[in-house]
């Protein structure tokens, strides 16, 4: 069977998903990420959510094309509003702005309370999101860079817990870590 090909941007998110995760893809669009993770055996099921019917239908189409509709749930909802806290422990929110990602997390405090792994890939407002995460008790464990064409993307690996205060430079560029 054919497998979905991930772009470098989505592959950087996929690399951070732990084996056996209960996974949600917020703003799934085509559902390439959860389909690839299922094909690789990294996860056993997924919740794919989107705010608009069109992208959610494309997601269903992708899952159907690869024979995975029985292993995925599709939710038409705003952010995490249609996902119950006990359904997932790993959440990807990629392809939207940092302010939108912060608003989604603010509306779902259970992501912090249940210590979910958050894989965040803001397309804009990265300094805003770093500041918001720090102020709301999350820690960025690491950041991965990926490149597609001339564009660089940053993926944040985020957990609940206090983060050392970021300097103004770190708010803009991220904290440099080894490994």
Language model feature labels by segment:
Residues 1-21, 35, 57-86:
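S-adenosyl-L-methionine
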